[in-house]
């Protein structure tokens, strides 16, 4: 009878957004326990070997990590299967590169290059605000952080801006109608838009109606929405496409236009 955690993960059972080859082997890296869920993270080995192409093999990845070249959220990480997740900042000082893990409009993780100034902070969604022993207030974030004595105005589902050097809250964004959000779950993962309406349903999920910059409207659950800026200005730079999901016909037209431009050139 099985006891404890499984230490292996079959490749066919790995999340689709890891984009692993079916025929590349029987197994996939099993994410370690950490700040993100195993189905909502990207292990460091896949970032270094499969995405950044700094290593060809498992052993080369271990060699790079053991030389303490890779930082996640400003801390050196040597665990090859450390689970990096949404909004995490991956830094490689040796090459002066910084990346932020974001979603593209197809729900896949995208390593988005950022400047050194942007790598000094991170946005975190507040899961809950509670009171501990002796009435000390504290909040929990989506990535497992616990921060004591937060601003009394910060509530659940708001977003806080954290300085990664001091781990202090620098600023916060209220979860309000009119603010820009990114969807982090469901069929609309990776889409960016402004909150237009909140529908409260007793005993069920709250529904959030979002409109992107092209005027397309869609709805999703409250738990799938992550506020990334005040008004329509995001506090983090966004990947190519700015979180706008095109229809199949619009994508085809865009490809045809690019092919025509290349032919004329």
UniProtKB/Swiss-Prot annotation:
One of its GO terms (molecular function) is structural constituent of ribosome. Coiled coil: none annotated. One of its GO terms (biological process) is translation. Keywords: Cytoplasm, Ribonucleoprotein, Ribosomal protein, RNA-binding, rRNA-binding. It is found in: Cytoplasm. InterPro entries: KOW, Rib_uL2_dom2, Ribosomal_eS4, Ribosomal_eS4_C, Ribosomal_eS4_central_region, Ribosomal_eS4_central_sf, Ribosomal_eS4_KOW, Ribosomal_eS4_N. It holds the Pfam family Ribosomal_S4e. Belongs to the eukaryotic ribosomal protein eS4 family. This is Small ribosomal subunit protein eS4. It comes from Zea mays.
């Amino acid at each position: 009878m099985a006891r404890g955690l499984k230490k292996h993960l079959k490749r066919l059972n790995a999340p689709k957004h890891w984009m692993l080859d079916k025929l590349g082997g029987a197994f996939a890296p099993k994410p370690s326990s950490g700040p993100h869920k195993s189905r909502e993270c990207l292990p460091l080995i896949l970032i270094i070997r499969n995405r950044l192409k700094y290593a060809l093999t498992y052993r080369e990845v271990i060699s790079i990590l053991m030389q303490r070249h890779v930082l996640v959220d400003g801390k050196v990480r040597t665990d090859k299967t450390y689970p990096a997740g949404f909004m995490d900042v991956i830094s490689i000082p040796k090459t002066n590169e910084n990346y932020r893990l974001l979603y593209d409009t197809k729900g896949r993780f995208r390593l988005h290059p950022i400047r050194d100034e942007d790598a000094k902070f991170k946005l975190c969604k507040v899961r809950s605000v509670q009171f501990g022993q002796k009435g000390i207030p504290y909040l929990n974030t989506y990535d497992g952080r616990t921060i004591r004595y937060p601003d009394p105005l910060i509530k659940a589902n708001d977003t806080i801006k954290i300085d990664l050097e001091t781990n202090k809250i620098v600023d916060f964004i209220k979860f309000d109608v009119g603010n820009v959000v990114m969807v982090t779950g469901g069929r609309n993962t990776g889409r960016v838009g402004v909150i237009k309406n909140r529908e409260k349903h007793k005993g069920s999920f709250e529904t959030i109606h979002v409109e992107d910059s092209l005027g397309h409207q869609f709805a999703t659950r409250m738990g799938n929405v992550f506020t990334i800026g005040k008004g329509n200005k995001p506090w983090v730079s966004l990947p190519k496409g700015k979180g706008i999901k095109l229809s199949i016909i619009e994508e085809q037209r865009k490809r045809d236009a690019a092919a025509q431009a290349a032919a004329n050139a």
